[in-house]
Amino acid sequence: MSDPNVNDAIEPVESVEDELGTVEGADNEDTEASAEAEAADDTVVAETDEDATDAEADETAEATDAEATEAEADADADAAEAEESEEEPEAEEPELDPIEKLRQELRVLPGEWYVIHTYAGYENRVKTNLEQRAVSLNVEDYIFQAEVPQEEVVQIKNGDRKTIRQNKLPGYVLVRMDLTNESWGVVRNTPGVTGFVGNAYDPYPLTLDEIVKMLAPEAEEKAAREAAEAEGKPAPQRKVEVQVLDFEVGDSVTVTDGPFATLQATINEINADSKKVKGLVEIFGRETPVELSFDQIQKN
């Protein structure tokens, strides 16, 4: 016979075991559920990361495409500018007027310009002597330059016409120098020099305008010649002074040929280009203007 108390005691044990099994099953279910949830979360995170990565990749690709497009646009713009530059060469700066160019060059040169007297006809010789003495006497640092301004003229003599270059300032030479006792002595004692223009021992230098005026004709002639040579053209003809060495206005001449032969005439105008003169011839007690050629008259 079983003891009811024992059965009662056993039943609680089974109940406890059942409860433990239930709890363990629940725990297992919770664990599985948690694992599934974690797996689901990992899947979501992975998918999210993949989406983010894809989005970043898309953005990077779009940015790269945009940069490439911009680079192509810049390259096209540069190419267009290069073509325009080739088609439209840069405008050249206008050349300075020869006189203004001369003025700028003279303004920056060292020293000042002085004028010295020379014996007539000794101008070029003085220039050469002075340049040589500046070197031999070691004053190149004080005496920089000597100039004899020249001009082109046409001379007519005995009916012959020829073009020559002659001194524009007969009896004078221009010297660019720093005036010191030593340099003054070298210039003053150069053969052919008679002295400085102005105060003999403390001469006054020329102004910039004065020296430009003296050197301008040669500068203009040089610029015109160089421009013509650059274009392959002959040098332009410049208007030059015409000197008639045979006759002068006011000369008394005898007519040697023509209807007024043997008559006396006084020259009041000379046309060197046509080789003719205009003068007054006395006819029947009255002075009559006539035109005569050079070969029709003889100087008295």
UniProtKB/Swiss-Prot annotation:
InterPro entries: KOW, NGN, NGN-like_dom, NGN_dom_sf, NusG-like, Rib_uL2_dom2, Transcrpt_antiterm_NusG, Transcrpt_antiterm_NusG_bac_CS. Keywords: Transcription, Transcription antitermination, Transcription regulation, Transcription termination. Residues 14-41, 47-97 have a biased composition (Acidic residues). The keyword Nucleotidyltransferase does not apply. Residues 1-99 are annotated as: Disordered. GO terms for cellular component: cytosol. It comes from the Bacteria. GO terms for biological process: DNA-templated transcription termination; regulation of DNA-templated transcription elongation; transcription antitermination; transcription elongation-coupled chromatin remodeling. Coiled coil: none annotated. Disulfide bonds: none annotated. Participates in transcription elongation, termination and antitermination. Belongs to the NusG family. PANTHER family: RHO-INTERACTING TRANSCRIPTION TERMINATION FACTOR NUSG, TRANSCRIPTION TERMINATION_ANTITERMINATION PROTEIN NUSG. This is Transcription termination/antitermination protein NusG. The lineage of its organism: Bacteria, Bacillati, Actinomycetota, Actinomycetes, Kitasatosporales. The gene is nusG.
